């Protein structure tokens, strides 16, 4: 039986490259006039509601046990609430390309967690972690141009740590077998969490629809529909139809896309040190995913996101749920 047409594979692959790579740019545009937690929370509520509608139309039940609901909510809060929500807040203070570079270290952080847990990790993979974290230091340390920048960098690093912890512990939780159902509940749980955070942080009093720019609203819709639904669907399809070694290439391509968009459309500048840091991060992630993706039984390294159906994907066992919501 012939496999899927090459054009389908390339279309799906470039969809996750470009869409997930552009989410950092879209977040930067959205928070120009939309409150950070409000925009992220409502985005996930909308995406979760649309996914629930799709499940209903296709006859798939969203009924799950209480344990699965609690696990889905906790994972959603870790990956999307604190992870993506933290990045969204960070981008009110730092460039989108900087946020993308920091988020790009998540696969390396998960490998570090696996090493600490005494899982078998190849020497080259472990060395790539040290190289990548050195790159992260170059990205973060030159950014001390005031307290706002320092706060933004700290938020982005904290968000990446939350995402890494969720990625590492996620497959140990009792989650629904259907990755789409799990993703739906994760989005809804994270959305509710972020809206509550926004209310507690006083965002409700700052919301003025008349002040929302068309660009910010369009970016918000793009994140909900393209970032969380269309790219998610392409990713889930790739996990079933493409070699995992090809699918995981998005982990080093996405930061590259984010850096290019930030420079071309937002006039974001990279210093020599930051550029070197970006090269070290992307290069080390390239080495890590190539080494891990080549192993038929390797544990998952990450996300995704995002966010999403990893029963048949040993390298990204829970990626569909994680990566979809970026």
Report the location of each language-model feature.
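Helix-helix packing/entry segments at the starts of transmembrane helices
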Residues: 40-42, 80, 99-105, 169-192, ...
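Hydrophobic transmembrane alpha-helices of multi-pass small-molecule transport proteins
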Residues: 51, 75, 105, 121-142, ...
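C-terminal-most transmembrane helix of multi-pass membrane proteins
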Residues: 1-2, 43-44, 141, 216, ...
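Juxtamembrane helix-entry segments on the extracytoplasmic side of multipass membrane proteins
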Residues: 4-10, 33-37, 41, 64-70, ...
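Transmembrane alpha-helical segments that form core, pore/gating elements
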Residues: 51, 109-112, 116, 146-205, ...
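Transmembrane alpha-helices of multi-pass small-molecule transport proteins
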Residues: 8-9, 33-82, 107-113, 162-166, ...
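Hydrophobic/aromatic residues within transmembrane alpha-helices
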Residues: 30, 39, 43, 90, ...
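Specific transmembrane alpha-helical segments of multi-pass solute transporters/efflux pumps
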Residues: 19, 23-26, 52-103, 138, ...
């Amino acid at each position: 039986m012939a496999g899927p047409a090459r054009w389908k594979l390339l279309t799906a692959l470039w969809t996750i490259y470009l869409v997930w790579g552009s989410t950092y740019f879209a977040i930067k545009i959205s928070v120009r006039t939309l409150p950070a937690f409000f925009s992220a929370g409502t985005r996930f509520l909308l995406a979760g509601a649309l996914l629930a509608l799709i499940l209903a139309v296709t006859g798939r039940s969203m009924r799950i046990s209480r344990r699965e609901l609690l696990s889905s909510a906790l994972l959603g809060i870790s990956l999307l609430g604190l992870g993506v929500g933290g990045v969204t807040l960070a981008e009110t203070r730092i460039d989108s390309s900087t946020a993308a570079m920091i988020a790009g270290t998540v696969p390396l952080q998960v490998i570090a967690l696996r090493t600490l847990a005494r899982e078998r990790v190849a020497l080259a993979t472990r060395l790539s972690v040290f190289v990548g974290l050195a790159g992260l230091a170059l990205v973060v340390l030159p950014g001390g141009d005031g307290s706002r920048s320092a706060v933004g960098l700290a938020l982005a690093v904290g968000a990446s740590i939350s995402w890494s912890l969720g990625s590492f512990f996620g497959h140990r939780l009792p989650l629904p077998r259907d990755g789409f159902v799990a993703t739906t509940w994760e989005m809804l749980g994270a959305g509710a969490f972020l809206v509550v955070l926004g209310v507690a942080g006083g965002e409700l009093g700052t919301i003025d629809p008349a002040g929302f720019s068309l660009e910010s609203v369009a970016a918000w819709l793009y994140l909900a529909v393209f970032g969380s639904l269309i790219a998610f669907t392409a990713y889930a399809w790739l996990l079933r139809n493409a070699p995992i070694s090809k699918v995981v290439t998005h982990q080093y391509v996405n930061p590259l896309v984010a850096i290019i968009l930030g420079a071309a459309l937002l006039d974001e500048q990279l210093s020599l040190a930051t550029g070197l840091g970006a090269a070290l991060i992307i290069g080390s992630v390239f080495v890590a995913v190539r080494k891990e993706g080549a192993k038929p039984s390797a544990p998952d390294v990450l996300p995704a996101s995002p966010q999403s159906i990893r029963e048949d994907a040993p390298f990204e066992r829970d990626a569909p749920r994680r990566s979809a919501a970026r």
